[in-house]
Amino acid sequence: MELILKYFPNLSEQQKTQFAALYDLYTDWNSKINVISRKDITNLYEHHVLHSLGIAKVINFTPDTQIMDLGTGGGFPGIPLAILFPEVQFHLVDSIGKKVKVATEIANAIGLKNVTFRHCRAEEEKRKFDFVVSRAVMPLGDLIKIIRKNIRQEQHNALPNGLICLKGGELEQETMPVKHKTMLYDLKNEFTEDFFKTKKVVYVTISGL
């Protein structure tokens, strides 16, 4: 929890309470339904919560922004972002029902009011959003093909509507074929921990489609 306050020192008391509750909740649920590697649960705040919040270092979402978290798994990056942006609406989608159950139960336990959930495949979600966020669920080109239909045209954020992904490693081969405007942000410039040395936020403009 101290790690979150290190980089986000201006949290409200409610946000602090919500972030602090995540460790016990994920530890408990993860013992029943595996949504995080059992070996990695002790790194929850660094590898999962703070990593999710890396998106907030790229864009400060305006109130009433509508965001879909595609392939949310146990709720990443959607739940940490929903805590940080209480006036933004998040819709968390995953094709695995038991993972959606965990994310739903955790969101309810901490009193998140700005999240909804759906158990479905990405292709089945037809609604429009300002942004789609995701954490390394599939190659970038494949992801763009699936979510193009979900990006609305109306703009009200500093960045045009589009896709924001958390990815790691060498991404040149993955981003080179992408025809949309793509920007890479190195999280090592925001977070000093070794885990973030190869981690990036990938932003793809997909507005107006």
Swiss-Prot record:
<keyword id="KW-0808">Transferase</keyword>
<feature type="binding site">
    <location>
        <begin position="122"/>
        <end position="123"/>
    </location>
    <ligand>
        <name>S-adenosyl-L-methionine</name>
    </ligand>
</feature>
<protein>
    <recommendedName>
        <fullName>Ribosomal RNA small subunit methyltransferase G</fullName>
        <ecNumber>2.1.1.-</ecNumber>
    </recommendedName>
</protein>
<feature type="binding site">
    <location>
        <position position="135"/>
    </location>
    <ligand>
        <name>S-adenosyl-L-methionine</name>
    </ligand>
</feature>
<dbReference type="InterPro" id="IPR003682">
    <property type="entry name" value="rRNA_ssu_MeTfrase_G"/>
</dbReference>
<dbReference type="InterPro" id="IPR029063">
    <property type="entry name" value="SAM-dependent_MTases_sf"/>
</dbReference>
<keyword id="KW-0949">S-adenosyl-L-methionine</keyword>
<keyword id="KW-0489">Methyltransferase</keyword>
<dbReference type="GO" id="GO:0070043">
    <property type="term" value="F:rRNA (guanine-N7-)-methyltransferase activity"/>
</dbReference>
<comment type="function">
    <text>Specifically methylates the N7 position of a guanine in 16S rRNA.</text>
</comment>
<feature type="binding site">
    <location>
        <position position="76"/>
    </location>
    <ligand>
        <name>S-adenosyl-L-methionine</name>
    </ligand>
</feature>
<keyword id="KW-0963">Cytoplasm</keyword>
<dbReference type="Pfam" id="PF02527">
    <property type="entry name" value="GidB"/>
</dbReference>
<dbReference type="GO" id="GO:0005829">
    <property type="term" value="C:cytosol"/>
</dbReference>
<keyword id="KW-0698">rRNA processing</keyword>
<comment type="similarity">
    <text>Belongs to the methyltransferase superfamily. RNA methyltransferase RsmG family.</text>
</comment>
<feature type="binding site">
    <location>
        <position position="71"/>
    </location>
    <ligand>
        <name>S-adenosyl-L-methionine</name>
    </ligand>
</feature>
